[in-house]
Amino acid sequence: MPEHSEAPDQPLPHPWANRRMRGSEMPRRSTTHPWATRGPVPPEGRIPNPVLSERFSAQRARPVARRRDEAEFELELLAESDSAAVESDPEADTGRGSGRSARSRPSVRKLGGGLVEMPKVTPLDPRAAVLTDPEVHEIKRFCWKCDAPVGRRTTDGPGEISGTCAACGSPFNFRPALGPGELVAGQYEVQGCLAHGGLGWVYLAVDRNVSDRWVVLKGLQNPLDFEAHVVALAERQFLSEMAYPGIVKIHNFVKHASGGRDIAAGYIVMEYVGGRSLKKMLDVLAPQRIPVAEAIAYLMEVLPALDYLHSFGLAYNDLKPDNIMVSEDEVKLIDLGAVAALDSYGSIYGTPGYQAPEITETGPTVAADLYSVGRTLAALMLELPVERDGNLAPVIPSPEQEPLLRRYPGLHRLLCRATEPDPRRRFPSAYAMYCQLVGVLRMVLAVDSGREHPQASAEFASILGDFGIDTLIGQTDRVIDGTQRMPMVDVADVVAALPAPLIDTEDPSAELLLPLLRGDPHQVLDALRRTSARIAAGVVAEPESFELEGALAAAQAHIELGDVVQARALLDELAPRHADDWRIEWHLGVAALLDGDFELGYRHFDTVHSMVPGEIAPPLALAAAAELMLQHLDEPGDPDRLHDAAMEHYRTVWRTNHGVVSAAFGLARRLAADGELLEAVAVLDEVPAASRHHAIAQMTGSLLLVSRPTAEITERDLDTAAARLTALPDDPRTLQLKVIVVGAAVEWLRAGAQPARLQSILGFPVTATGLRQGLESSLRALAQIAPDRWHRYRLIDLANQVRPRSWW
């Protein structure tokens, strides 16, 4: 039988370049891949086979979840040996069965968008993966027709390898149909068994017609199983036309009669994928788990492959660590036995513990695949609870139960959304989950490395505004004008700084709305009214999403104008019909802040954070809302909880992105409130020198260094505070702080401290007389620029009080 065309040797461009998607992902019907980064897809390769879908539907009125072997398609012998990378060049010799050697590879491959180094996988001879005694464990023997247990141990002895099902009378035979040396279809020389999957044995073979390359033959457990034949046909028809580097290649489909059987069995011929499965990696690491960043990076490689299937109207259906293979330079899905058309009915193959709970009701869906992504990610990193039957319990531990999730709170939120019991609350597409996984990975790396890992948001506009910058340093303005100021964050500043959600550039309404959203809010509202009138008059066709997108744009404009009532009216009307759109929650949260209901705003932002856990805008909003609650409520219900929440979220944002300076000042405020002044100074020192707020950060650091009780201030604190001010340009606040620093030094000496090495502060000798003279001259300099005449007199009086005694 002729071979199908194979995937190109060169890796395809990343499928998600320059694309983002918020809505539910549906099978694409265009002639190009959804991201248009690859060549045209043959029409026969992208349209689900209607005959096959009808066959699935004819099998059963409702889907029935069927058990798959836990070791399915894992290449089980990898538990004893690491296996070789698959593809090699035809020039070198690696022994019988393959005349190819590994291609030249980069010495280090990085995953996760280049952020995570791929672990080294040692290449070995593929023949080492062949099972010496291929046998299906009794606990994994089920009737191919009725799914009843068969071949089990009884009081008379071990279970039978072959026989008849007692429940339905169907024959079963768990012996491998092919033996070593057997030539299948005159082309594929069998080397032995690799593993047993849910649809039969998996064999290693050598393709004698194509450079003696290694291939895998996947056979059916029972040739009489029509349903299994249909599933195999699905692989051949759907997948042989596709070529994606993250999915095992289908080379051929052949039939072969062997083992004295009269009926020819079908075999799918696939590329041999060596390396280690993630299941094998877990076994080697036990009882430890795969590091968090590495586990996330693996799933980031898998999600584009899943999305590739989804774009063709297919669901993978059985994602788990066993089915993800890591070779020396790639991560690949290796088992296609459960692939089925989206929303098709019939037998559904999957693995308990990883399979979505609703799949028997809905059939294969994108949401079900993403559920298994979340479960797989959790299984790689966490020791998940196990049920009596040995399957993973369908729960995600809480941060209180799992320290790892306390360390990475964004990761916990991502796992919870991916595995939501309600599929409507999960990520709407593989791309949407990928975007959030990238953000969570950057948060994880920021925690682990202590370095920021910023990225451009896929969902929010840039955070351009700031709030709370002057909250601490602004208190020193009392020195120059005599006005008392409370260290409070301004609500209007917070709202102005929070970014607006972006409209999806691929949304049907984007082309119509994007030109209208430039300008001030009044212009935006006027443009929206004129556009709505043109649509009503039939001049312009109404995009299907215009009602939602237009209302959101109008709500944003009303919020910018401070018209909370009108904004909330629009949002309340949208909410019942678009309950899963987090942008409504975001706008409601901002409106609640403007309305002074900070607790309600916090709840809205918390919902948004759970839906887009990889974004930094929601934790920034949560931190601000918690701080606003603390400073505006006379008797907060739980001030410690609010303080901790504000600190945690400010820390998350600042640790991840040092461009969001509001988070640095917010974290410094919370640390200062805890009395951790030196830690607050350390945070402010991280504000980049290129930031327009660098000078204020340095001033605030100087203020905090001398704000502790006099007995706790050290000589180094005074020297550092003075050095900061010396390096800054002169402005009124620098002069104010000089007064404060010199005054602190005066009190430090008065308390009995003696300088060890410090000779001068801000040019004044570190003696009682020298510092008093310095304080006097600084106060007189302030008096010259004081805006209020009466306060100017007070400054002069104070200067006279501190000047050293003299005879003139």
Language model feature labels by segment:
Residues 203-204, 211-222:
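Glycine-rich ATP phosphate-binding loop
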Residues 249-266:
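Short beta-strand micro-motifs within the conserved protein kinase catalytic domain, predominantly
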Residues 191-198, 202:
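Protein kinase glycine-rich loop
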Residues 447-554:
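Regulatory extensions appended to serine/threonine kinase catalytic cores
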